[in-house]
Each structure stands twice: as C-alpha cells, then as structure tokens.
C-alpha cells in the first residue's frame, strides 16, 4: 500500500478461504509438515470498498487453524493503508488461539504490523494468557524523513512488550524495495526476559529458528509479577 488507489481495480483483495496467498500457505504447510503464517488483503462486503489486513495461520494438514484482523491502521506518509484496509472489528479484538505443536499447546496471538506499536495490544494478549505473539510486519524507511532509521525503535518497542507482558514474540519483517520504501528486514524472536534469541540481517532474506521453553513465561512473571501488582482501578 505504498500509493493511493486511483480506482477500485487498484485494490486487489482476495478471498480468505481460497485466494492465492492462502493457497500458497496451504501447499507450503502440507509439503513441509509445518505451520505457516501469512498475512493478506482480505476481501469483505463493505460499502466503502475496504478490506481487512488479516493474519492467517495454516496447520500442517493444510487447514486454516487461526486468523486475526489487524486492529490499528496507520495514516503515515507513504503508507496509504487507510485507503485499502478497514480497522479490525472491536468485538473479540484479541482472539487467543490454542495451537497444538508437538507435545505442547501454545496460546497464540496474531496481531499485525502497526498493532505492534501499541502497548494495549500486547497487554491484552498477556492478560488473556498468551504465550507467543507473531507480528507479520512490513516496515521500512519513512518517505518524508528518509534519513530517519526507525528500526532500533521498532525493535526496542517489541522487546519491551515481551518484557512487560511475559511473552515470546516473533516479528518477521520484509526486506527489499517497493516504490519509495526500503524495507529493513531485521526479523527477530524475543523471549520474556528481553533476550533476542535470533535475528535476521537488514538486506537479505533469512530463515530463523529458535527453541523456546514455555515455562520461561511463568518464571519471568514470578520474578517480576507485573500482572499481580497492576492497579486497574487507577487506569481510567
């Protein structure tokens, strides 16, 4: 969404059940016997012609295991997402998906990109008992401030969410050029202790693998009991 649509034909949403992105993910999941997460421009029936930016998780059997619509839509220069995407619905905005992986069950949240800047998102998922958040991301240079590198800020904010909410967070980001935007990659996985377990370079694609111990979430929240000592009576 690096340019404004000039006509409805510039918008190319897809059906979430059988569109090309999900079809690709289903094939990849079955062929490799893994879960595959993708994000796509979901087609919905709306009077304004907008769709949703939706994260989808496909199981190894090729079936859709989870999906979540992006809540927050940026209006920053060069990222014309509000011309394509509607805000995600406010009913059940933070769905938690229980996914069986090997011998463990993981409580998974699937917020998207701009959602990762908002502490309320990670906090709500943390309070609901999420173990892992996966933020599919497309962030890079700022066209109106090309000298400003936001990558360190992006990384710091997400790692901070992991610490404050006792979460594992995977933040895959694209790389390469599109229009005026240079996407700065740097995908990473962080743990509740604020450690970056693995990280990709800025300028090339990479496959990241990390082993996570879900018990570390409770270890961290026992050491720093943020949830137990909250004061929601003072927050409104």
Which role does the model predict for each range below?
Residues 16-43, 163-174:
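A short, hydrophobic beta-strand-centered structural micro-motif
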Residues 88, 168-236:
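C-terminal beta-strand edge segments of enzyme domains
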Residues 2-3, 56, 67-74, 188, ...:
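Short beta->alpha transition motifs characteristic of CBS
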Residues 38-40, 53-57, 95-97, 187-189, ...:
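Short beta-strand scaffold segments in enzyme catalytic cores
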Residues 4-5, 145-149, 179-187:
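Histidine/acidic-residue-rich catalytic or RNA/ligand-binding cores of hydrolases
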Residues 152-160, 165-168:
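Catalytic phosphate-donor-binding core of small-molecule kinases
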Residues 1-13, 136-138:
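Short, conserved active-site loops that position catalytic residues or coordinate cofactors/metal ions
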Residues 14-17, 23, 27, 45-132, ...:
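Active-site catalytic loop in hydrolytic enzyme cores
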């Amino acid at each position: 969404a690096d340019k404004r649509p000039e006509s409805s034909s510039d918008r190319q949403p897809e059906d979430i059940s059988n569109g090309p992105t999900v079809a690709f993910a289903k094939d990849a999941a079955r062929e490799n016997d893994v879960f595959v997460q993708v994000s796509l421009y979901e087609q919905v029936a709306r009077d304004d012609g907008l769709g949703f930016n939706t994260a989808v998780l496909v199981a190894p059997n090729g079936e859709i295991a989870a999906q979540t619509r992006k809540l927050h839509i940026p209006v920053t220069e060069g990222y014309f997402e509000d011309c394509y995407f509607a805000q995600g619905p406010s009913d059940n905005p933070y769905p938690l998906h229980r996914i069986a992986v090997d011998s463990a069950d993981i409580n998974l949240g699937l917020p998207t990109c701009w959602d990762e800047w908002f502490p309320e998102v990670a906090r709500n998922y943390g309070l609901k008992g999420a173990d892992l958040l996966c933020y599919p991301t497309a962030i890079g240079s700022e066209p109106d401030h090309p000298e400003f590198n936001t990558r360190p800020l992006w990384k710091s904010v997400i790692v901070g969410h992991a610490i404050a909410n006792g979460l594992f967070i995977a933040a895959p980001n694209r790389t390469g050029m599109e229009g005026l935007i240079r996407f700065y990659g740097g995908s990473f996985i962080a743990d509740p202790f604020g450690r970056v377990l693995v990280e990709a370079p800025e300028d090339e694609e990479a496959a990241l693998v990390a082993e996570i111990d879900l018990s570390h979430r409770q270890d961290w929240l026992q050491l720093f009991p943020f949830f137990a000592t909250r004061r929601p009576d003072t927050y409104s």
